[in-house]
From Swiss-Prot:
Role played: Part of the cluster that mediates the biosynthesis of a highly modified cyclo-arginine-tryptophan dipeptide (cRW). The first step of the pathway is perfornmed by the arginine-containing cyclodipeptide synthase (RCPDS) avaA that acts as the scaffold-generating enzyme and is responsible for formation of the cyclo-Arg-Trp (cRW) diketopiperazine. AvaB then acts as a multifunctional flavoenzyme that is responsible for generating the cyclo-Arg-formylkynurenine DKP, which can be deformylated by avaC. AvaB then further catalyzes an additional N-oxidation followed by cyclization and dehydration.
Protein's gene: avaO
Organism: Aspergillus versicolor
Name of one Pfam family that matches: PhyH
Protein name (database record): Ava biosynthesis cluster protein O
Pathway stated in the Swiss-Prot or TrEMBL entry: Secondary metabolite biosynthesis
Lineage: Eukaryota, Fungi, Dikarya, Ascomycota, Pezizomycotina
């Protein structure tokens, strides 16, 4: 079975989907949700045990080796593209990885599901069919450049998604990992009150995009208002949540530790259309990925599966 996935920007479909979600936080929760709503991001320590985190590390290494391209986690000479499956900045999104047994096990860890259920105050949740993250340090065949961005449509001014990442391996200051600009979600509307050019395209059409890459001068705008990037230091089993309006990116691994993580996002089922649910079911049955969004843009993906 071969699978081809193409994206279709269809305004009639986009119009059917609710983009900005109806979610007004309470004035006070008395737990980590207060910090999340204040800063737009939060680290939830020990969402899963270190033992379970190591299990997922082992499964990710096993997944890489199953391609039989000669990769050996103990032999740095094999940490090159010719020994690895296709990826994007360390993210593995293809080959049906979104539906690997261990990937689903991570999504359904009680500590992960409970965090999203607590945030949204419902256990009727949809999960993203997203990828895994494996960053090999000191790779000489990779040119790494900063790519500050937000996974949010610039034309949508309110909250539309809370992204998540479950960390599996020790992640210190010299290890590759997530960098975010804490609190930057609060000035998202102010920044995009002016017309902004996406660094990836001069004539960028925001209408069908959930991604914006910032220029260097954009970063100065945030810095002038007191915002700065922070490299997260995470332990095995820590869960990170952030408002998709938060400016973030990742840094290249310079130490000895391989970075292991998984992107996990859950949103209330009530935010999805019937069409989105139908297409999501199709994706699940055919081992197809979606974006970080569990409830939207599912209908923007046209799938064609044929016998090879």
């Amino acid at each position: 079975m071969s699978t081809t996935t193409t994206e279709s920007a269809n305004p009639s479909l986009a119009a059917q989907e609710k983009i900005e979600v109806d979610f007004t936080p309470k004035e006070h929760y008395g737990d980590w949700r207060d910090e999340f709503h204040r800063e737009g991001c939060i680290i939830i320590r020990n969402a899963v045990s270190p033992e379970r985190a190591q299990y997922y590390v082992d499964k990710q290494i096993e997944w890489l080796k199953n391609f039989e391209l000669g990769f050996d986690e103990k032999d740095e000479s094999t940490w090159t593209a010719e020994h690895l499956p296709v990826s994007f900045r360390g993210g593995k999104y293809y080959y049906g990885v979104a539906h690997e047994k261990s990937v689903w096990e991570a999504r359904t860890e009680p500590g992960v599901m409970d965090a999203f259920a607590k945030l949204w105050e419902t256990d009727e949740l949809l999960c993203s069919f997203d990828g895994i993250k494996i960053d090999l340090p000191r790779r000489k065949d990779v040119k790494w450049t900063p790519w500050p961005h937000c996974d949010h449509n610039p034309d949508v001014k309110g909250l539309s998604c809370v992204q998540g990442m479950l960390n599996f391996a020790p992640n210190g200051p010299n290890d590759g990992g997530l960098i975010w600009m804490k609190g930057s979600a609060k000035v998202f509307n102010e920044f995009f009150a002016e017309q902004r050019k996406n660094e990836d395209a001069e004539n960028f059409d925001h209408k069908h995009q959930e991604f914006f890459k910032f220029h260097e001068d954009h970063m100065k705008w945030f810095e002038d208002r007191g915002y700065a990037f922070t490299k997260l230091e995470l332990g095995p089993g820590d869960l990170v949540l952030w408002d998709s309006r938060t400016v973030h990116h990742s840094c290249f691994a310079a130490g000895d530790q391989i970075r292991h993580a998984q992107y996990i996002c859950m949103m209330p089922k009530r935010f999805a259309t019937e069409k989105a649910l139908e297409t999501k079911k199709y994706c699940f049955e055919h081992y197809l990925p979606n974006t970080h969004l569990p409830h939207r843009w599912v209908t923007q993906i046209v799938h064609h599966c044929e016998e090879s």
